């Protein structure tokens, strides 16, 4: 099947919403949220990432979230917005199986972290190489590597390893939640990652022939919204960040300003975004959902054992991101 190409721009790891009383999936809100983000100009969504509380869901629930997100986008006219699924297990066999289930549910790409439960045995370069390339061999959808040391017992893949793994034709990108812009620069340069057009980056990269033939140019994702502009200046392709659930249009605005060559304005927008994103980062999933509730009228709470914010804490989060939200609300939808 032809896959929707990954484009430069802003992506969000979407939240999974639950009934506040029963903790059952709140499917209408999951669908509404996906469409809101697409209207704001996001060019791709990740289901079942860290922000999506994948570790709190059953496999059946994961498939439901992916399927409902995909169908909501298509029905709203956003069939060109691909769904990426977090599909990580600890074994090669289990990860391939989850990739297949994600594909059946409507995902076009899979986001994969290194196996880490047996870190003493799996945290070496050769084992990680074999893990990712074996999964890529068996997956029906292309893979995006997910370098997130904080979630995988400190395993931090260096640029040499990422470049080596990414020679596989079914591996098409990396998400750098390690926030290492030097590493991102080296990987983006070595793999000829796509970059958005801009007078600030006149030498646009050409796709490697192997990836072009497969219609899969390489994508280097900045993994946190507070270095969106830095990602672009480093030759990166896109941002895939939790803050885009709350302030998507401000994230898109930074990309638009960069593309227009308006660096000073882009830097001013980045400063505002960085301050707000730090509030959301510290407040984590409960705080991000609380911010969505405060400013959009839905959001609710995470599944237990994640704690709910108190009314005072929720009010504090909303107040601290107020300046960014004023700009967010002033910006038009893109689509």
UniProtKB/Swiss-Prot annotation:
GO molecular function annotations of the record: 4-hydroxy-tetrahydrodipicolinate synthase activity
Active site: 175
Record key words, sorted: Carbohydrate metabolism, Lyase
Keyword Lyase appears in the UniProt entry: yes
CDD domains according to UniProt: DHDPS-like
EC identifiers of the protein: 4.1.2.54
Residue positions binding substrate: 50-51
Keyword Lyase: yes
Site features described as Involved in proton transfer during cleavage, chain residue numbers: 146
Catalytic activity field: 2-dehydro-3-deoxy-L-galactonate = L-glyceraldehyde + pyruvate
InterPro entries reported for this sequence: Aldolase_TIM, DapA-like
Pathways involved: Carbohydrate acid metabolism
Role summary: Mediates the conversion of 2-dehydro-3-deoxy-L-galactonate to pyruvate and L-glyceraldehyde in D-galacturonate catabolic process.
UniProt-listed PANTHER family: DIHYDRODIPICOLINATE SYNTHASE, DIHYDRODIPICOLINATE SYNTHETASE FAMILY PROTEIN (AFU_ORTHOLOGUE AFUA_3G11920)
Protein family: Belongs to the DapA family.
Protein name: L-threo-3-deoxy-hexylosonate aldolase
Organism (species): Aspergillus niger
Originating gene: gaaC
């Amino acid at each position: 099947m032809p896959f929707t190409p990954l484009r430069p721009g802003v992506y969000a790891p979407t939240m999974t919403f639950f009934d506040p009383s029963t903790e059952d999936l709140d499917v209408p809100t999951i669908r509404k949220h996906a469409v809101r983000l697409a209207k704001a100009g996001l060019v791709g969504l990740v289901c079942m990432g860290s922000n999506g509380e994948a570790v709190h869901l059953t496999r059946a629930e994961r498939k439901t979230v992916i399927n409902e997100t995909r169908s909501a986008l298509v029905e709203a006219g956003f069939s060109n917005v691909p769904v990426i699924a977090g599909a990580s297990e600890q074994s090669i066999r289990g990860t391939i199986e989850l990739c297949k289930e994600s594909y059946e549910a409507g995902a076009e790409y899979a986001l994969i972290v290194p196996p880490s439960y047996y870190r003493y045995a799996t945290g070496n370069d050769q084992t990680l190489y074999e893990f990712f390339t074996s999964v890529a061999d068996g997956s029906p959808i292309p893979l995006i590597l997910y370098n997130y040391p904080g979630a995988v017992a400190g395993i931090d893949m260096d640029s040499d390893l990422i470049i080596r793994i990414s020679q596989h034709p079914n591996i098409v990108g990396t998400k750098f939640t390690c926030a290492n812009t030097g590493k991102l620069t080296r990987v983006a340069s070595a793999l000829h990652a796509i970059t958005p057009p801009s007078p600030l980056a006149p030498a646009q990269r050409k796709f490697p022939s192997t990836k072009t033939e497969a219609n899969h140019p390489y994508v280097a994702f900045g993994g946190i919204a507070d270095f969106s502009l830095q990602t672009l200046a480093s030759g990166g392709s896109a941002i895939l960040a939790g803050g885009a659930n709350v302030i998507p249009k401000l994230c898109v605005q930074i990309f638009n300003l960069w593309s227009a060559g308006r660096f000073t304005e882009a830097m001013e927008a980045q400063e505002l975004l960085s301050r707000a994103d730090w509030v959301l980062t510290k407040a984590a999933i409960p705080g991000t959902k609380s911010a969505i509730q405060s400013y959009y009228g839905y959001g609710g709470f995470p599944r237990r054992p994640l704690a709910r914010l108190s009314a005072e804490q929720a009010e504090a989060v909303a107040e601290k991101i107020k300046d960014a939200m004023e700009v967010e609300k002033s910006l038009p939808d893109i689509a």
